[in-house]
Amino acid sequence: MIRTAAALALALVALPASAEEAPYRPDCGRIDAFLGKLVADGRTVGASALVWKDGAEACFEAVGDADREAARPIARDTLFQIYSMTKPVTGVALMQLWEQGKFGLDDPLEWHLPEYAALKVADGENPDGSPILREPKRKVTIRDVLRHTAGFTYGADGEPQNAADRAWSRLQPLAFDKTLAEFSQAMAQVPLLYDPGAHWHYSAGVDVQARLVEVLSGQPFAEYVAQHIFQPLGMKDSGWKRTPADRARLASAYYAEAGALVPVPEALLLEPNFKGKPMTMGGAGIVTTVDDYMTFARMLLGQGTLNGTRILKPSTLRLMTTDQLDPRIPTENRQWLPGKGSGGFGIDLFVRTAPPQSPQENRGSVGEFFWDGFPSMLFWVDPAQDMAVVFATQKIPFDNAMHREFREAVYGADYQGPAGD
């Protein structure tokens, strides 16, 4: 028995490298087949995917239409509304100013935006519908604003059910006709849903970040981002304000309704982009291409630097991609965040802290970070695999199942992380 075991051990050591577990490589054919099935099954009108691995492009696949009614196919230069994938761009902009010493992460928000000095927590409602308000247990800090623990709301998805969402509905802080300064004044009048630090709750806090960029830099938000992120990185197709010529490349958005995909009227989504409205949200609004956003993702993969251009210090990028949530915040107080996978939240980014815990969980590597956008957009950066991925489509409402299946197409259904982890 001992001789047999020793012989087996020797045989294993002598195995050629090809017999060992092969390094992970994305299967471009599998990704293309997945996109084709999405379109063939009527789950979206068109989609594209770009994968960058080990310092080079690994895959670009595009299937279906950018505009079904015009019979215009998805192309490499198609423009997409990325919605909440705007948020990491805003976070990078604000953290550049943090590097310059313009603020501290634990500064009370009111030090830099005085309109928030009188924030109250909504603690129910009186019989006449008026809010019951109380003082928060502590001040909202900029760190809270960066990690969605301020207690802010994003408004109700449907009929308002509490005093904070009713105030949002009445004040409409993010109305397209408002500037970011006007947004912030209105937002400061909306009561907090929770005490600062008590809950993770997705909110308009990233739009507050955009206003902070304006106040701390002395520049309009979109101008700052263009000068300090887009232009240095060569992201020529990215921005909020668009020209009429851009319509020829713009992907239309479609709403899934009663088994059909219905075009979304432009007025519901694109007025700030094409009609000169003043709002430039920090949490949404950028229109870009998969290549431009991949440039941004590659900068993140490069620890803040791309092609010799430094946007952030490596230490700042590590801070952004480290879980910032207090472990004492229970799962039930993290809204829908646990559905993104085994992890937490950094600065405007989900951060994976453990391998997938079940077959139903999104595939990914420990240390990856990502975010997504309302029309089922998605990007992620996987440092362990030296990989960045951008998935682009314009299917509303947000389709989490589509993302889970796309990740399986990229990684394989059984992926748990790099070999040896």
Q: Predicted regions span which residues?
A:
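Short, surface-exposed beta-strand/loop micro-motifs that present aromatic residues
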Residues: E368, P375-Q385
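N-terminal signal peptide c-region/cleavage motif recognized by signal peptidases
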Residues: A14-S18
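Short, conserved catalytic-motif segment at the N-terminal edge
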Residues: A22-I82, K102-G104, A118-E125, N400, ...
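Active-site SXXK
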Residues: G29-L38, A49, G55-E57, F80-L109, ...
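Short, surface-exposed loop or secondary-structure junction motifs
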Residues: P114, A118-R363
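Bacterial N-terminal signal peptides that target proteins for export
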Residues: M1-A6
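A generic structural motif
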Residues: G64-A66, L268, K395
